[in-house]
């Protein structure tokens, strides 16, 4: 590696002179696919399975995106090898879902036996749990019977398909058998016949924790409806979400310049209007989960020397070699959403750090490494000009985006350097209307109902009067939707917990809460 070359060869001029340095860079996706196609036959022969070309492409694409810290083609080869081994194992062993369900039945049987032993010595408090165990056992047995039947059908069809592939006289039966197998599997195969893109995505999901559904999503279809997907979580900000979605579509289709991040946005607006929730929703939609959100609170970086915390200390300073908070986070997750919160509170020297990031998509850390930001979406949040926005919308509720941008331009120009201001897109978040606030109240109360159902098995009936009261209480200009959580935590949830504890202390367990 380059570090070893510097350590052992460069320091010895005589030794360095006797070697010609050949720089070997990581291949691009097309070259990596070509290399894997050359290796594919060896792995297929070793594991005794067929590896499709879409599996090769998926191995390269998904490994580049989700397996950080390693290089292509090495990580794609490991991914393809593991996927091939899984397909081979699925043909020779009982599928993992069946094994897991049998283990669940065994665990329930052990718990049931322990409870019966307690009852035998006079403990009568386990009747409700015994009934629940019986219901769980019935449900698992029904699922197990259905899956074992389907597994038998899949295994029979798979064996017939493998036999047809080796028998030239039966080649015409392959298409019909393949259709039957697809109909039986219904997008949830218990065993694999070939190594395909789904098999590779399953391995990535197990290694990284990214949901399989996110890995298998059609990115083009997802981008077309991105603003609608975001609007399910961010309520009442349609124009802002539309602006973000349009910019991201331009980046993903290759129309925007390729030497910068996917998008750089400054989200400006009053507190509690959905700016942080937008970052969470984008991480979930684009990169498979909220774990792909990197949050940096810039209110902690009000001194010029705090720059080293973000990018790492330079040589000779305390902390050299430990990396920076931002640079190391992006190195580990190059496909992520970077949220720079409260950007107006950061020192100007800290903001100067982002000129090259916004423009060319990279930052050089304290050790001289170039950290690639080109696959990130960068969101900055700020309350600059919030009072002006609220004042204009109070006077003219139907003010256009252009009018709001003209209103904010002097405020932003006073705070940000013109060169920095030209490097990001400003997105304005409006004060939430009553209808949007009521929708958010309903979502928050629904989350409380789900928690009660999950922990206590209780059904919840929420009166309209409660939703109306919470909505009216949250229509304050300075707090927005953030006040909903405050009201729930301070007034609603303490009363609920008191009632629940009182009922449980009295030995009663209510099934419905109103």
Across the structure, where does each feature detected by a protein language model lie?
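AAA+ P-loop NTPase nucleotide-binding core of proteostasis motors
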Residues: 1-514
């Amino acid at each position: 590696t380059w570090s070893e070359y510097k350590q052992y060869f460069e320091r010895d001029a005589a030794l360095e002179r006797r070697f010609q340095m050949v720089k070997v860079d990581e291949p691009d996706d097309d070259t990596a696919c070509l290399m894997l196609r050359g290796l594919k036959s060896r792995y297929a022969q070793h594991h005794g399975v067929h590896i499709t070309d879409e599996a090769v492409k998926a191995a390269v694409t998904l490994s580049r995106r989700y397996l950080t810290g390693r290089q292509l083609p090495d990580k794609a080869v490991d991914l393809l090898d593991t996927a091939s081994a899984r397909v081979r194992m699925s043909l020779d062993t009982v599928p993992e879902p069946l094994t897991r369900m049998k283990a669940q039945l065994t665990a329930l049987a052990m718990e049931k036996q322990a409870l019966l032993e307690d009852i035998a010595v006079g403990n009568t408090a386990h009747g409700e749990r015994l009934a629940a165990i019986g219901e769980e056992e019935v449900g698992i047995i029904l699922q197990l019977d259905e899956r074992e039947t389907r597994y038998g059908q899949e295994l029979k069809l798979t064996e017939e398909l493998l036999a047809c592939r080796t028998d030239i006289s039966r080649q015409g039966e392959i298409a019909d058998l393949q259709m039957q197998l697809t109909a039986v599997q219904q997008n949830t195969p218990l065993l694999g016949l070939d190594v395909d893109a789904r098999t590779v995505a399953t391995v990535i999901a197990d290694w990284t924790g990214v949901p399989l559904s996110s890995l298998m999503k059609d990115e083009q279809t997802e981008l077309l409806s991105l603003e609608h997907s975001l609007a399910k979580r961010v309520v009442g900000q349609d124009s802002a979400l539309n602006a973000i979605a349009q910019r991201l579509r331009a980046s993903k289709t290759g129309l925007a310049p390729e030497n910068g991040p996917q998008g750089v946005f400054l989200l400006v607006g009053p507190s509690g209007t959905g700016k942080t929730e937008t970052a969470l929703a984008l991480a979930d939609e684009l990169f498979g989960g909220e774990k792909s959100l990197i949050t940096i609170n810039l209110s902690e970086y009000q001194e010029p020397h705090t720059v080293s915390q973000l990018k790492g200390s330079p040589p000779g300073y305390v902390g050299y070699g430990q990396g920076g908070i931002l640079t190391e986070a992006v190195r580990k997750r190059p496909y992520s959403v970077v949220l720079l919160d409260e950007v107006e509170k950061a020192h100007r020297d800290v903001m100067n750090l982002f000129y090259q990031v916004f423009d060319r998509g990279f930052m050089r850390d304290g050790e001289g490494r170039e950290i690639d930001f080109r696959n990130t979406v960068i969101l900055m949040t700020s309350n600059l000009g919030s009072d002006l926005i609220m004042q204009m919308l109070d006077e003219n509720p139907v003010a256009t985006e252009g009018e709001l941008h003209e209103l904010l331009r002097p405020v932003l120009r006073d705070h940000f350097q013109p060169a920095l201001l030209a490097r990001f897109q400003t997105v304005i978040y409006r004060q939430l209307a009553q209808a949007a606030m009521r929708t958010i109240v309903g979502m928050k109360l629904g989350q409380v109902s789900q928690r009660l159902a999950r922990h206590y098995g209780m059904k919840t009936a929420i009166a309209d009067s409660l939703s109306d009261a919470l909505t009216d209480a949250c229509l304050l200009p300075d707090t927005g939707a953030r006040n909903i959580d405050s009201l729930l935590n301070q007034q609603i949830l303490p009363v609920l917990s008191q009632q629940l504890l009182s009922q449980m202390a009295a030995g009663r367990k209510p099934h419905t809460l109103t």
